[in-house]
């Protein structure tokens, strides 16, 4: 089996290409999930202030027999805190029982409030202080990103967006790449695979490689150059989602999956959400 792959970000920092997302998990569920994930080989964990489970993540990491330097921890600045990123980050650090965050993401742009540039400036300062290694955003459209770059001169290293076979966001993915912004996929399995896992191309590839539909879709993300964070609290699924290093999809197979794109957004519209 090949080793899990890593991605080098434009700021020089390195992150695992595959991590565990913990959205919708309770503090108790998160502790068990992370323990299992660490056993399997995960080293990247993605939480957020809005998930209300940073304390559980912190407890799990405190109990882990893995060095802090081997871990890659992501959390996020919530919409209500755009005008107080320092206080929000310090609160997250306290709950996570950490001295620094590997990746701090602004969760949504919330253009209706229009504080995202100021929030970004605050995040830049926190990075300079060493409280954050890398800074990025979630759910930013091209015009939001361009404004950040124009007004601060600092480009996010990550744009974490809804991305799955039904919503491939190719234009945004390409724009990110042109600007050396790594695209990261949330809801990578289209919320449990509905409308994806039963597609003939996915089933055929699962049969060909002796894998599950979920593993095929995760491999599609990896082979498309995306960072991917499937979420689960089920031990067997956590292990299954990480067992993707012994095969690759070829260019034609990636092209077949590309045909599934419907522009079907399952989550909120970033231009409308919040406020």
From Swiss-Prot:
Tell me yes or no: is Cytoplasm among this UniProt entry's keywords.
yes
Q: Where does NADP(+) bind?
A: 187-241
Keywords of the record: Cytoplasm, NADP, Oxidoreductase
Q: Where does substrate bind?
A: 107
Q: Which domain of life is it from?
A: Bacteria
Say where the protein is mainly found: cytoplasm
Q: Has keyword Repeat?
A: no
Q: Where in the cell is it found?
A: Cytoplasm
SUPFAM superfamilies assigned to the protein according to its UniProt record, in alphabetical order: NAD(P)-linked oxidoreductase
Specify the protein name. Methylglyoxal reductase DkgA
Q: Which organism is it from?
A: Escherichia coli O157:H7
């Amino acid at each position: 089996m090949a080793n899990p792959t890593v991605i080098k970000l434009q700021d020089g920092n390195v992150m695992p290409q595959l991590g565990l997302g913990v959205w919708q998990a309770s503090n108790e569920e998160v502790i068990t999930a992370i323990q299992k994930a660490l056993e399997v080989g995960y080293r990247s964990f993605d939480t957020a202030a809005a998930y209300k489970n940073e304390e559980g993540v912190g407890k799990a990491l405190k109990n882990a027999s893995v060095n802090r330097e081997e871990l890659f921890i992501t959390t996020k600045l919530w919409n209500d805190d755009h005008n107080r990123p320092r206080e929000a980050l310090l609160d997250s650090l306290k709950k996570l029982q950490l001295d620094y965050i590997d990746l701090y993401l602004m969760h949504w742009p919330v253009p209706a409030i229009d504080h995202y540039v100021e929030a970004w400036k605050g995040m830049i300062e926190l990075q300079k202080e060493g409280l954050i290694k890398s800074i990025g955003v979630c759910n930013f459209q091209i015009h939001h990103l361009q404004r950040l770059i124009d007004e601060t001169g600092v480009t996010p290293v990550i744009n974490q967006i809804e991305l799955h076979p039904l919503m491939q966001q190719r234009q945004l993915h390409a724009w990110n790449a042109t600007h050396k912004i790594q695209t990261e996929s949330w809801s990578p399995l289209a919320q449990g695979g509905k409308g994806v896992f039963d597609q003939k191309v996915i089933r055929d590839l699962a049969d060909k490689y002796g894998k599950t539909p979920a593993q095929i879709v995760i491999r599609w993300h990896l082979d498309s150059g995306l960072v991917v964070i499937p979420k689960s609290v089920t031990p067997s699924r956590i292990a299954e989602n990480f067992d993707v290093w012994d095969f690759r999809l070829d260019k034609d197979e990636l092209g077949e999956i590309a045909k599934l794109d419907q522009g079907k957004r399952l989550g909120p519209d970033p231009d409308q959400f919040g406020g």
